[in-house]
Amino acid sequence: VCNAAVNPFHGSALDIPDTAFDRIMECNIRSNSWLCNMAIPGMIEQKDGVLIIVSSIGGIRGSKELGAYSISKAADMQIVRNYAVEFGPDNIRANCIAPGLIITDFARALYEDPERRDNRESATPLRRLGDPDEIAGAAVMMASPAGSYLTGQTLVIDGGTTIQP
């Protein structure tokens, strides 16, 4: 399971420094690729394996302030599709989880501010934030026999946020 994310910049795509853009891509994309590429040879040898990348709903939504982060998370979704096609014949499955706002250290600034939290919860049909166990449960399913015919997919777990108009 790959779960890498940094976002040192909030603002317009016109203003992001190259160093911030590079850091986002290095951590959020390249590190996932490296980890998968280290694991895949052993999976090929045993003709079995599961790759899971934790992405974000940012990868399927546009953003005025999180553009580079969103680009990196969309890339995660494409990585699993490519790995699924390339390594599926070796019985290696690759899938992605795209969480909405989950109560984690990474999202602390979004949920500790009462106004921001209220805004996010009111924009979510379930009217709450997600719990890390809800993401972990999806990863367990993907890695278990219950997920044995699932590959190349992105599972959105966001309390319904992305279905809102």
Language-model regions, residue ranges each:
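Short C-terminal tail/terminal secondary-structure segment
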Residues: 10, 61, 140, 151-165
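C-terminal helical subdomain
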Residues: 33, 96-99, 118-146, 150, ...
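Residue(s) in the substrate-gating loop at a strand-loop-helix junction
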Residues: 56
